[in-house]
Amino acid sequence: MQNVNTYDCIKKLVTQLISVLIVINTIAWPSIPKAYPIFAQQSYENPREATGRIVCSNCHLAKKLVDIEVPQSVLPNTVFEAVVKIPYDMQIKQVLANGKKGALNVGAVLILPEGFELAPPDRIPPDTKEKIGNLYFQAYRPNKNNILVIGPVPGKKYSEIVFPILSPDPALNKETHFLKYPIYVGGNRGRGQIYPDGSKSNNTVYNASATGRVSKISRKEKGGYEITVENTLDGRSVVDTVPPGPELIISEGESIKVDQPLTNNPNVGGFGQGDAEVVPQDPLRVQGLLLFLASVTIAQIFLVLKKKQFEKVQLAEMNF
């Protein structure tokens, strides 16, 4: 009986410990650099604003390049590759949430036309599966299968991300047509500078909140600094807090102005967006084009043969 009580006690203690860890992880999760795709999904119904800007740029302030490659035309109900390229210098390291340096992650959002969606696993060709690797794609919303997000994933391994896309069949989906459609993409490398609530991350520059003289700089126990700025006019002091990560570019005794940078800008990443176009091709149109080309080729062959025959007749008449 005592053993049973002891077992129940231990089981209860372990359950409580797991619950506490889950709560702590939930609270701390936003500061972790792996959270950025979720920020957009939680805060915005659509990742692309009416102005054409993708909402990831609200948190990732630096502009960087991103590129996308898709076929110019695709047949209905076929799988094709959309390759998103997020280039950056693989040697650089970023500031992590704890202030230490680490490798960059990358992420991307792909906005497809209505009707296009992620290809089912059983439809993806083996060579495409090999390019995808262990990547996991998800829909931006349960009702938006045409908007796909990925990341964060290690940038050194996935600076090129291959999306397997299934094209629609206009014969079955009456909302799609054999027209030219735009595809939009956004891609980022590294952590953002601002969280959705407007607060700064430790991956950005910190500015002075007041004009005055730096009277004291204190290093905090867990990293970062507290900078005391004394107003030389009224003697009031303001304390600016800098989290671990950014490096100070001011010193004690220095006179500073409001909004003057106190730190360097540690950000080495950035966000970029691009677009491409794809045209679903009508198979009958393709067959008609091939038939037309074949008929033109045959006509040219007959024309050449007829010309040679005519030349032979002319030559025979001249000899006669």
From Swiss-Prot:
Chain sites annotated for binding heme = Y36, C56, C59, H60
Q: List the disulfide bonds.
A: none
Instruction: Name the domain of life.
Output: Eukaryota
Q: Which Pfam families match?
A: Apocytochr_F_C, Apocytochr_F_N
Gene Ontology MF term list: electron transfer activity; heme binding; iron ion binding
Q: What is this protein called?
A: Cytochrome f
**Keywords tagged on the record:** Chloroplast, Electron transport, Heme, Iron, Membrane, Metal-binding, Photosynthesis, Plastid, Signal, Thylakoid, Transmembrane, Transmembrane helix, Transport
Q: Where in the cell is it found?
A: Plastid, Chloroplast thylakoid membrane
Q: Which InterPro entries match?
A: Cyt-f_TM, Cyt_f, Cyt_f_lg_dom, Cyt_f_lg_dom_sf, Rudment_hybrid_motif
UniProt signal peptide: 1-35
Membrane topology according to the record: Single-pass membrane protein
Q: Which organism is it from?
A: Huperzia lucidula
Q: Tell me its family.
A: Belongs to the cytochrome f family.
Biological classification of the source: Eukaryota, Viridiplantae, Streptophyta, Embryophyta, Tracheophyta
An example of a Gene Ontology cellular component annotation for this protein is:
chloroplast thylakoid membrane
What is the role of the protein in this entry?
A: Component of the cytochrome b6-f complex, which mediates electron transfer between photosystem II (PSII) and photosystem I (PSI), cyclic electron flow around PSI, and state transitions.
